[in-house]
Amino acid sequence: MSIMAYNGGACIVMVGKNCVAIASDLRFGIQQQTISNDFPKVYRINDKCFVGISGLVTDAQTLYQKLVFRHNLYKLREERDMSPRVVSNLLTNMLYEKRFGPYFTEPLICGLEGPDNTPFISGMDLIGASVATDDFLVVGTMTPAMYGVCETLYKKDMNEDDLFETISQCMLASLDRDALSGWGAIVHVITPTQVITKKLLGRQD
């Protein structure tokens, strides 16, 4: 088994009209053994930027703690929050710096950029090779199942309600096709005025 699939888990980010959504499953396991069903892989950096980290859980937590440390230093020095693009560049550098002994994680970054709240999403592999797009990105053990559903259901310029419905349906449909992730999901929809967070009840087996 790949070390990337050792703990299972999966994340999706999607772009809407002046909003973005990020979702992850809630399972934490060790190979086929389920340890917890309340372990989201999505972390809040600030009100307009979230990071989803799939892969080896120990590395994901270490990477998140280092990212929060860097973000707090930036906030002290600059007196403002990091934008999603800055967070993406920082994560890319942090991962590439450890390329000879990498963190076994695949981060996704999403948020709203600048005063006009332009949606931004990006993802990267374990050594920081980043990809930015304007529709959706998926990472984790159920990637093969997620791609088809996301390509089928995704539409451009969805409002926040449609975006929530679409990302939820993609998540729930994919969870049934992967034994290493599932047990429900959590969805965050980031809008210019608020962050909407909801939990989804999936199959508990």
From Swiss-Prot:
Chief location bin: cytoplasm
Entry's Gene Ontology BP terms: proteasomal protein catabolic process; proteasome-mediated ubiquitin-dependent protein catabolic process
Cytoplasm recorded as keyword: yes
Superkingdom field: Eukaryota
PANTHER family the UniProt entry points to: METALLOPROTEASE TLDD (PTHR32194), PROTEASOME SUBUNIT BETA TYPE-3 (PTHR32194:SF10)
Description of how the protein assembles with itself and partners: The 26S proteasome consists of a 20S proteasome core and two 19S regulatory subunits. The 20S proteasome core is composed of 28 subunits that are arranged in four stacked rings, resulting in a barrel-shaped structure. The two end rings are each formed by seven alpha subunits, and the two central rings are each formed by seven beta subunits. The catalytic chamber with the active sites is on the inside of the barrel.
Protein name: Proteasome subunit beta type-3
Organism of derivation: Dictyostelium discoideum (Social amoeba)
Classification of source organism: Eukaryota, Amoebozoa, Evosea, Eumycetozoa, Dictyostelia
Gene responsible for this protein: psmB3
